[in-house]
């Protein structure tokens, strides 16, 4: 994934140099927001990279204020226009967890309504939307199910790191449960390590508490052989490269 504080074109070159065969393109401030979709599409094609789209997790798509919801939808459409210009056909959305004084049922319903509208906007541009599991609300199958019920073509974007956060006493990583519920909708995967608890650390693979061989086994049992983003954040690029090498080694080693 490109770092949104740097030039998108420079980030694409960096990702290509590190041996990756696709880019998880995030369009958000401060720098990535200014990307020219046509330039991005030309560069990725020239380098032989495919791409999926990623959007800011903090867009208030389900805000209690109608004015904020309209603005968030307009901003999301702005992203979709850039993705469409780049030839990207799969884009994620994060449910909005920030609805104080609302019940779980209200939060789920408001997000289902918002994501239905965004999915329509995406479809008009030839793009399929996928929803990412989070770490508070929308961490469980029960939270996510109303979204999929409302939007039949909505894809599932599995974040294995998020599935390891805010677990109950004795509760294992939620990946197997989420795949059992939504494996037939699986469209993309994010991986990064953490130590559980509430901190989404985005550590290199193997630096936290996640059993990555078991995670890969679960993906293979679900029939997954598609795109996987190493969402490892560090100033030192070698941590990302090492995670790539480890993932490839484990993927080749593990059997379903």
Mark where each language-model region is.
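Acidic/histidine-rich catalytic cores of soluble enzymes
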Residues: 22-23, 117-209
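Active-site-proximal loop/turn and secondary-structure-junction residues that shape catalytic pockets
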Residues: 2-3, 27-29, 57-59, 95-99, ...
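Active-site acidic/histidine proton-transfer and metal-coordination neighborhood
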Residues: 7, 62-156, 210
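Acidic (Asp/Glu)-rich catalytic clusters
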Residues: 12-18, 33-53, 78-87, 116-124, ...
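Hydrophobic faces of well-ordered beta-strands that scaffold small-molecule active sites
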Residues: 1, 23-25, 51-55, 91-93, ...
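Conserved, mostly hydrophobic/aromatic
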Residues: 15, 23, 44, 72, ...
